[in-house]
Regions:
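Helix-loop-helix hairpins and the membrane-proximal interhelical loops
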Residues: 1-60, 191-299, 384-385, 401-407, ...
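Transmembrane alpha-helix interface/packing and boundary motifs in multi-pass membrane proteins
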Residues: 27-41, 71-83, 158-163, 260-272, ...
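Short helix-coil transition sites and intra-membrane helix breaks within transmembrane domains
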Residues: 32-42, 80-91, 123-127, 266-275, ...
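Re-entrant/interfacial helical elements at transmembrane boundaries that shape
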Residues: 41-51, 64, 79-99, 130, ...
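Membrane-interface alpha-helices at helix entry/exit sites of multi-pass transporters
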Residues: 58-62, 99-116, 290-302, 330-333, ...
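A structural-propensity feature for long, helix-poor, extended segments
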Residues: 68-79, 86, 299-324, 328, ...
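Membrane-embedded alpha-helical segments of transport systems
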Residues: 69-74, 115-127, 179, 304-318, ...
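Membrane-embedded alpha-helical modules
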Residues: 111-227, 341-495
Length: 501
């Protein structure tokens, strides 16, 4: 009852005009940063961090929360309209979001993304409010062995993504893994495949790679179509409300709930992040859907799964931050700096000494999710006007944005050069009909997989010791089961096709 009283007082405090204005501004800035490739939520929070110095601790942290929520959600806008993931979390949104936009359903795709990203956020914030301490205890049980198990399980999802053409899918995934090996090895820092080039020592950054694979390759393909006169104009169908009916909303609820649980669970584990949760939710939705053949061609289920999961990661990532003082991702690491600026110490004592700030954050999270919903819905008709801009004007602008965003990631020209390299890689994937999804999944998971494997072997002295960890065993054997089942289905389909011929 005391907790509910504190939460009620926090809602009253958060809904004061000054606090609301700051949160609206924070959400709006976050959306802008999230929608521009290369300008991430981390950058937006870093920009706002010194501005909160003169505010009260509660108001300052609430403003940072607003920027965080807006930044993660904003990535869906460019992912759907331009096939450019604004943030790493919105990678999987491009798989079905942009095909829907090409089919004239841009407003429906945006509507689905906006509604279910808000719902995913609210779901995780409810979990954060009422279950944070107990979930933090579970997170402490995850050692490098368990994290390796999760990453290995995620990696085997390539077999599902490659269904229909296993050889091409596995080839695409292997190329993604190869790129993660370039640079210094995790833990010991041994240079690999750098060929004496100092720029390759740090490897390829995630955002420039994704910008190249999606945006630059799309520019090359579109330019080729313009040259051959095959370019089709994109029609934007007008819709009422968010573009979907109540019947469709009810249909998507099981997918939403499953994906939000995945997102919250992944968020609790430090270092894994929203991009992984979005991909896992997408693959799970595809595997459990009756319309799996429609995924990648403009299936609304894909958007619902991804946006529910990556926004649910926000609340999950804040659980270890608030309860243990351990940041769950890059943005919460910035927010840890916010606590220090305001003289607060994140961890168990925060709930005792500064309960008003903690419950203020809980209330601000829920209010900011609603603000994000209203702000994006208000601007939805303006967003889709991007599709009406002539391609000969739009493509150079996108190219400039891509280059600026890539440079802003680490302030090095090498990232601008790398988006061009990966743009050519993505273009070749398109020409040879290789799927980009396995490449992206393997690129995202590869480095984490190796890092947790090395840490686990250092801790337990051998890989065999991993099998003494029950949680690892569950993920490992489920992953093996997925692999065996996928190969069996592929072989059975091959035999059926051969018999029919």
């Amino acid at each position: 009852m005391q907790a509910l009283g504190l939460l009620g007082n926090a809602f009253v405090s958060v809904c004061q005009p000054a606090s609301l204005l700051l949160m609206i501004a924070g959400v709006a800035v976050g959306i802008i940063f999230g929608s521009i490739p290369g300008l991430s939520a981390s950058m937006a929070v870093a920009l706002f961090l010194p501005l909160t110095f003169s505010m009260t601790p509660s108001m300052g942290m609430n403003t940072l929360v607003a920027v965080y929520i807006g930044g993660i959600s904003g990535g869906l806008i460019s992912a759907i309209l331009l096939n450019m993931p604004g943030t790493a979390s919105s990678i999987a949104t491009t798989f079905d979001g942009h095909p829907m936009a090409k089919n004239g359903e841009a407003m429906k795709a945006l509507g689905l993304g906006i509604v279910f990203s808000a719902m995913g956020s609210i779901f995780s914030f409810i979990v954060l409010t009422f279950c944070a301490p107990s979930l933090a205890d579970i997170a402490l049980k995850f050692t490098p062995a368990e994290n390796f198990g999760i990453c290995f399980f995620a990696l085997t999802m390539v077999a599902i993504l490659a269904s229909g053409n296993m050889i091409k899918g596995l080839l695409a995934g292997m190329l993604g893994l190869m790129f993660t090996l370039i640079g210094m090895a995790p833990i010991d820092g041994t240079p690999r495949f750098t060929f004496g080039a100092s720029n390759l020592m740090a490897g390829f950054d995630t955002l420039p790679t994704l910008i190249g694979i999606f945006a630059i390759s799309d520019i090359l393909c579109t330019a080729e179509s313009m040259g051959s006169g095959k370019l089709e104009t994109i029609e934007v169908k007008k819709v009422k409300g968010f573009g979907f009916s109540m019947k469709e909303f009810v249909y998507h609820l099981p997918n939403f709930l499953r994906s939000a649980i995945i997102g919250t669970g992944i968020g609790i584990l430090p270092g894994i992040g929203g991009s992984t949760s979005g991909m896992l939710a997408y693959v799970t939705a595809k595997n459990m859907s009756k319309k799996r053949d429609e995924f990648g061609k403009g299936c609304p289920d894909g958007i619902v799964a991804t946006e529910s999961a990556n926004n649910a990661t926000i609340g999950g990532a804040m659980i270890p931050l608030l309860v243990l003082g351990i940041p769950g991702d890059g943005v919460t690491a910035m927010m840890l700096g916010g606590f220090l600026i305001h003289g607060l110490s994140a961890g168990p004592l925060l709930f005792v000494k500064n309960a008003d700030v903690v419950y203020g954050i809980f209330a601000a999270c829920m209010v900011c999710a609603l603000i994000m919903l209203v702000v994006e819905w208000t601007c939805i008709k303006g967003f889709v006007q991007v599709l009406k801009v002539p391609k000969h004007i739009l493509l150079p602008l996108i190219l400039v944005l891509c280059c600026v965003g890539a440079y802003a990631t680490n302030n090095r020209i090498f990232d601008v050069q790398s988006i061009l390299v990966f743009g050519i890689v993505g273009y070749l994937y398109h020409k040879f009909s290789l799927p980009t999804t396995p490449f992206v999944l393997c690129f995202l998971i590869g480095e984490m997989l190796e890092t947790y494997l090395r840490r686990g072997i250092m801790q337990y002295k051998s890989f065999g010791a991993f099998f003494a960890r029950p949680i690892f065993d569950v993920f490992f054997f489920i992953a093996i089961g997925v692999l065996v089942w996928s190969v069996y289905k592929e072989y059975k389909a091959y035999l059926d096709k051969k018999k029919a011929a």
